[in-house]
């Protein structure tokens, strides 16, 4: 439909086709930037023999500034009209989303009680996409793909999960003896006991850890293991994980003994589950869009 407007030889930024075009340009630049960061070290090595690496600082300084406006447009673009959209009408359309974004952002920072600029930007962008596409799905806005709205909703969940697990993660490495206690975030962890267990093809030392919240209510029991496989002569560590919608908490049992205690690694990763849920929602949105398009093709044929 947008080709009808481009055929008149003018371009309006505040329109659905304008947002699509700008977003496509931004995403193309992001892909080119990532590709450059991937192949540049190979090119340098091929011509000079020198080995260089392109790491996180490059992508943070190049990709992030480009992806932020793309995400903002992703939230507002679907609400715009074809051809030309009045600016006041745009504000009227996005006002509920702005309010919802502010409320959810305040709620998330109230839960984690830790502020950072990166976390603030990431959470705002995530809830901006989530709230806009949630409104689209609830209001059942005409001429808008349900599959696309679901996929964009999933992108918001994915960004939320990545932000939370990157900004608020915490880890602790301690040596603990039986009945020893340590704390990470709002959880108290007690090393209850050590058991020797035997599996079908291995023997193991299993740690028993009790996890309590700030009100001294037991949250879960975690049982990491150190396993030994005699036939293959291999030692492995098996982490024990407790997951909910707010965080992953897992413990890894290292080397040790009864006299000196054991090395214990404790990891606190917030919102990780939303990375997986967001990815599944994006996949679901793609399947729904494909199904709708196949139906349209059958009708046309």
Please place each PLM-identified region on the residue numbering.
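Contiguous transmembrane helix-bundle modules in multi-pass membrane proteins
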Residues: 1-184, 189, 272-301
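Generic detection of intrinsically disordered/low-complexity segments and helix-coil linkers/edges
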Residues: 52-53, 222, 261, 268
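Short beta-turn/strand-loop junction motif enriched in small, turn-promoting residues
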Residues: 163, 194-197, 269
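Soluble non-transmembrane domains of integral membrane proteins
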Residues: 173-262
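Individual transmembrane alpha-helix segments
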Residues: 259-275
């Amino acid at each position: 439909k947008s080709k009808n407007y481009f055929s008149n030889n003018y371009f309006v930024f505040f329109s659905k086709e304008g947002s699509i075009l700008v977003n496509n340009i931004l995403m193309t630049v992001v892909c080119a930037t990532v590709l450059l960061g991937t192949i540049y070290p190979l090119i340098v090595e091929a011509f000079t023999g020198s080995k260089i690496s392109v790491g996180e600082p490059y992508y943070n300084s190049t990709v992030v500034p480009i992806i932020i406006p793309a995400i903002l447009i992703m939230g507002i673009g679907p609400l715009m009209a074809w051809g030309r959209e009045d600016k006041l009408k745009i504000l009227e359309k996005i006002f509920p989303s702005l309010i919802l974004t502010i409320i959810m952002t305040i709620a998330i920072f109230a839960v984690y009680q830790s502020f950072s600029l990166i976390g603030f930007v990431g959470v705002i962008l995530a809830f901006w996409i989530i709230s806009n596409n949630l409104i689209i799905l609830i209001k059942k806005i005409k001429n808008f793909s349900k599959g696309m709205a679901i996929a964009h909703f999933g992108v918001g969940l994915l960004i939320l999960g990545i932000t939370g697990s990157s900004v608020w993660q915490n880890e602790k490495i301690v040596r603990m003896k039986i009945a020893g206690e340590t704390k990470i975030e709002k959880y108290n962890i007690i090393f209850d006991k050590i058991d020797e267990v035997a599996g079908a093809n291995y023997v193991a030392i299993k740690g028993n850890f009790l996890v309590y919240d700030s009100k001294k209510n037991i949250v879960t029991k975690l049982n990491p293991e150190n396993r030994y496989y005699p036939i293959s002569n291999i030692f492995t560590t098996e982490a024990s994980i407790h997951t909910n919608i707010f965080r992953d908490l897992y413990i890894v049992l290292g080397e040790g003994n009864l006299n000196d205690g054991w090395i214990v690694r404790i990891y606190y990763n917030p919102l990780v589950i939303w990375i997986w849920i967001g990815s599944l929602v994006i996949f679901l949105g793609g399947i729904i869009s494909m199904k709708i398009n196949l139906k349209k093709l059958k009708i046309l044929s």
